[in-house]
Design a protein with these regions (language model features):
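A general structural signal marking secondary-structure boundaries and capping sites
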Residues: 59, 158, 173-176
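Feature marks short, surface-exposed loop/turn motifs that line or immediately flank catalytic pockets
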Residues: 48, 123, 145-149, 193
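Residue-level recognition of short, structured coil/turn motifs
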Residues: 49, 156, 177-180
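Conserved phosphate-donor/acceptor-positioning beta-strand/loop module used by diverse small-molecule
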Residues: 141-143
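Surface-exposed cleft-lining segments at the edges of enzyme active sites
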Residues: 153-158, 187-191
Length: 194
């Protein structure tokens, strides 16, 4: 939801009033409790279909806990009215495993909140690409390898998942181009000691 001057409204520096409120509140919860975030990271589901060697949340045990769509959907308009401008769906599991992720994206968009994802990309299927990609500002895919064998070792999954992710990226990129979407599609990788 950038403005006409291409100033990214999601950066804290563009919200001096909110910064002032935070500084004034200090450690006083009564003053701080009405200062809301500009950006949120939400984990729609606790389950993950990979067991990455670098995972920082593996300690939670990958419980298959999902956000309840109805309750979360009711909160989205409230969040927007309180100043939340963007939500990144990522977190403690693979966000695209949520059975109603496309409905979550639609409800988030309808509330006027910008949407982004961090995903391993295995579940980024045609339905997600066609229904959610047009409503999303950016998607970051965790590829983390250049070969299927290395990918399988790092992600603790089958080698075929690497090819599936690469195919999904290609499909998303073609769909973006064919439909004139502005959604940024990127990959992340990392360096690990051998």
């Amino acid at each position: 939801m950038s403005d006409d001057y291409a100033i990214d409204g999601h950066k804290l520096a563009y919200h001096p009033q909110r910064i002032g409120q935070l500084l004034d509140a200090g450690d006083d919860w009564e003053k701080a409790k009405s200062i809301y975030p500009i950006y949120m990271e939400v984990s729609p589901v606790g389950a993950c279909n990979h067991r990455c060697t670098f995972c920082g949340v593996d300690y939670i045990g990958y419980k298959s806990i999902s956000l309840e769509f109805k309750k979360f959907g009711e909160r989205l308009k409230e969040m927007a009215s309180l100043g939340v401008k963007s939500i990144m769906y990522a977190g403690e599991g693979e966000p695209l495993l949520h059975k109603r992720i496309n409905e979550i994206v639609r409800a988030t968009h309808d509330a006027g909140i910008d949407i982004s994802f961090t995903t391993n990309g295995t579940q980024m299927d045609k339905t997600f690409i066609e229904s959610s990609l047009p409503l999303t500002q950016w998607v970051k895919l965790s590829v983390n390898a250049a070969t299927a064998a290395t990918y399988a070792g790092i992600h603790q999954t089958k080698e075929r998942d690497f090819n599936k992710v690469i195919e999904n990226i290609a499909q998303a990129t073609h769909f973006k181009r064919d439909h004139g979407l502005t959604c940024a599609i990127g990959v992340q990788t990392l360096l690990l000691p051998e």
